Amino acid sequence: MSQPTLVALDIETTGLDPQRDAIIEIGAIRFRGDRLEGEYHTLLNPGRSIPRNVVDLTGITDAMVARAPRAIDKLPELEAFVGDDPVVGHNVRFDLSFLRVGKILRYNEAVDTYPIASALLPTATRYNLGALARQLGIVLPATHRALDDTRVTVAVYQTLYQRALALPLKTLAEIVNLQQDVDWGANLLFEEALRARSRELASGRAAPGSISLEPRTLPRGLVPVAEPTPLDDEALAHLLEPGGAFAQRFANYEFRPEQVRMLKAVARAFSEGKHAMIEAGTGTGKSFAYLVPAAQWAVQNGQRVVVSTNTINLQEQLLRKDVPDVEAALKIGLRAALLKGRSNYLCPRRLDNARRHRPKQADEMRVLAKVLTWLATETPAGD
């Protein structure tokens, strides 16, 4: 089934108020899927001086629009170019608010790449058009002009559509189901993505439904030994010494005597069942100094070892970098899990409550779609 014809557009204006400010440039592109079908562009004379900040942003000067037509003469052309097709834009309601003052495009469906991106790129830190283009690998033009921004908008929409197609079918179907009573600017894209995969639904290979948050089946836990075997602190220290396992594994490994002394102190504390309070300065290599004996103790004696950190950033570093390095250097099978404070995790009860009550407003739908996509594609643990 072919995709619908869409018209992406962008305008440049003298300000932000559609009742007081005026349009100075319009750019529009008609497209269907990956195929571009036409472009429309015009400068407009606003009948007033263009503010300095707008000149700096767009490069459009009073001289450039001095002989340009007025909006009243060109808006009918734009209306004919767009027709009844849905209008795509980034924060598109801003553009449409100006155009509807001119009494055109009042009934066209609005498709907004902002909520679409918010849902499909749940971990992005910024959602302005330039930031999205950079994140998606889209080349940005040198100028901030209407037709240039429209081309970027088309590329962003097409890329996000492919992202929607790649969603798990259950997630895609649930988003479409939840958005039925809400116009949030992303309805058309998700409906088209689900329609494009309708054959997969019909074949029975997957069925729509809710994302499961049931606990996963884990392998058998550790079986602790009755009498723990003490650690060989000298053998562990050798791993960190010149020519040891770490030096062989890491090209830029640097031997640090303070690190070895700390490792031995930690190993003795494990072996003797005592507390140890150790102060070590920056550059000591503290992580390996306590992780090496901790890992060896866990594997050797079948006991869990808890490492409590002061920051989440250090937790992430240990789990994603240091623990795998220790496992590789020691050549042991090591399982590690990350446990954060309760406030760092999604509450399944609240999520299910939001699903049952269904979103009533666009912002509610955007956040719920964002969470569902995040659960399906970004996080294995809901944190």
Language-model features and meaning:
Residues 1-109, 115, 122-144:
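Conserved non-catalytic scaffold segment of RNase H-like nuclease domains
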Residues 271-293, 305:
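Walker A/P-loop
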